[in-house]
């Protein structure tokens, strides 16, 4: 009788552990980002439909529910340079509060990892969705539309109130879009 009870407890413990492992794997960080986020710079340019250099002029907490565990924020942008797509002077993107960008190893996108497949300075929320954060007053090279990648919302350093003209990513995108 005692042996039977111990076996039941052991089975129950094993089942509980396995269930816990299965559930916890789904609640962990994004282990395998979607394939469409893992592109090369050339692939990103080929897929682009709307590209602008824009400055963040407003960040407003959104009434949308918090997704990915972080509160939603509406960011309003003023277009500084329109590079591709339908020209607009302003647009709004919904992102999230809290940092989603690791510190850059270079301020002008000259670091090698940025240029690799899947490179960029943005990372996913635990549900594998990109919800970028932005800083009011700063410039960004924005690729709007699908697919959003880790390079779709890159900060471009501000030099004397303007986007850095020597930024490698910005220069690359401008050159490639002229050739399209």
Question: What are the language-model segments listed below?
Answer:
Residues 2-14:
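Bacterial N-terminal signal peptides that target proteins for export
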Residues 5-6, 19-21, 179:
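Generic detector of low-complexity/intrinsically disordered segments
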């Amino acid at each position: 009788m005692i042996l039977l009870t111990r076996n039941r407890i052991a089975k129950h413990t094993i089942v509980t552990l396995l269930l816990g492992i299965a559930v916890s794997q789904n609640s962990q960080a994004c282990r395998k980002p979607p394939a469409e986020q893992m592109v090369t710079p050339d692939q990103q340019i080929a897929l682009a439909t709307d590209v602008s250099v824009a400055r963040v002029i407003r960040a407003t907490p959104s009434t949308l529910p918090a997704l990915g565990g972080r509160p939603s924020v509406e960011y309003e942008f003023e277009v500084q340079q329109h590079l591709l797509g339908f020209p607009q002077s302003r647009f709004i993107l919904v992102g999230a509060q809290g940092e989603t960008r690791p510190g850059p190893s270079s301020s002008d996108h000259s670091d090698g990892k940025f240029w690799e497949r899947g490179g960029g300075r943005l990372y996913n929320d635990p549900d594998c969705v990109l919800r970028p954060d932005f800083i009011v007053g700063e410039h960004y090279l924005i690729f709007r539309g699908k697919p959003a990648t880790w390079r779709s919302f890159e900060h471009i350093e501000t030099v004397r109130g303007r986007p850095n003209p020597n930024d490698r990513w910005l220069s690359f995108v401008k050159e490639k879009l002229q050739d399209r």
